[in-house]
Amino acid sequence: MQSFGRRSFLAGAAALGLARSARAASSMGTARGPVQASWPSLVDNYRYPDWFRDAKLGLWSHWGPQSVPQQGDWYGRFMYMQGHPMYEHHLKTYGHPSVAGMKDIQHLWTADKWDPDALIARYQKAGAKYFMALACHHDNLDCYDSRYHAWNSLRVGPKKDVVGIWEKAARKAGLKFGVSNHAAHAWHWYQPAYGYDPTGPKKGERYDAFRLRKADGVGQWWEGLDPQELYTGGHAVLPDGIDSIEAMNQWHDANNGQWIETGPKEDPAYVTRWLLRQTDLVEKYRPDLVYMDDHELPFGPVGLEAAADYYNRSIQWHGKIDVVLTGKQLKPYARFGMVQDVERGFTDHLWDEPWQTDTCIGDWFYNVARLNDKSYKSAEEVIQRLADVVSKNGNLLLSIPQPGDGSIDSEEEKILDGMTGWMAHGGEAIFGSRPWRIYGEGPTELIAGMQNEEKAKPFTAQDIRFTTNKGALYALFLGRPAGSTTIRSLARGRIEGQISQVTLLGGGPLAFRQDGAGLHVDMPRNNSFVPAIRIDGRGLV
């Protein structure tokens, strides 16, 4: 099915003349090679790397200056929106955003308890086969030695090449290394920083992004840096005269709160700088995986330039395209030219092509409330998710949030320990595996799509997922069965082949019988979470 889809798209593209618009290299100095900046060329040249299909689990350090306040996601936007809890926290903790802005939060990012080697070792024990570092989020600070963006982590905050240090630690441990780029959205995401309080004693007083220019930094910690480069310029600025929080929120939602993939019309240089920053990132750190926080690719043809550059560089590095580029909400044809990522979501069917879901045990950026109220995903929930995703031909990219100092908290350590314990016996059903004929069975229905985790119902002992590995069939129980358990998909007459042995991973052989109703297995009581069995026999796989 995959080959047919690829051929069909390429034939249609040729008929429409789409391929002829491609260029071998751009005027931006992107890498030359066979891959051109067009969808037909991406599709024609791309093949999913075996290492990615084998890896199954990646760990992600979604870590940057927005972790400093320990309030969760999108602090750099919501701190500028009066009435939001993050605005109130900022006002009490750091001061009014007309004086203390996001640039000052970035200055407070210390990373003084960050031990990358120890964290990588812990993540690897928990099953990670690849590791991803956040390179730049919507707050527009490059967390690496950026050639084209002065607001970077060597000049601001920890004064370290965060991505470079992560990269060395990951590769030393033998992990594949990835980076995530979220910067394409900074130009509209940051616009509340140009606003003001619509009510209260500071009513109408513009925030720091509106007021400050490079010359204002003389004698300040940010001397020599231009705040407009960080805050991206006023592209959708709150107009004067709004006098209620409700009206302010409505204006922001309508004018700069949309998730769009175009650049600012009046500032094409912003898009040019984005491409320079992206190609610089890829050239410096040679990532095995690049995560784009975008629907397909950002900025239309410029995103295609970035993709072609990355693939051509991979050919220079490896002699072939041996890297992964992910995007979201891909059209069917695009899934043959890059890898689909489903953020905080599920799929309800077995995919023909590899894909990835990314999620976090808590908020993307560290939120201390998750520690205090113990609301992280448990190790059991993580492994349930992993089994479901892998059975459907996917990978799981899991974020373990860190506070600004770079540590992880005690509850996160427990979750990683739980994952480590499960991997010791269950890993053979996951790593290097491939899907079976069907992904599984059970009563729990999952709603497909991104950003829908909260709609998911708890799994039961009847929810079972299948994988295959080295000629064996595996069944993973998402709940905790006890006593005689029936796998209906393995009923005599429904499958060909003969079952000779059933073994509990981490245990021993189990009694079983097979009839027209299913495979009946005597499971021990007091199982650990997500017990997995290996099913051996002839003609099963």
Residue ranges and their predicted role:
Residues 11, 27-541:
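Mature catalytic domains of secreted/periplasmic carbohydrate-active enzymes
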Residues 1-16:
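N-terminal secretory signal peptides and thylakoid transit peptides that target proteins
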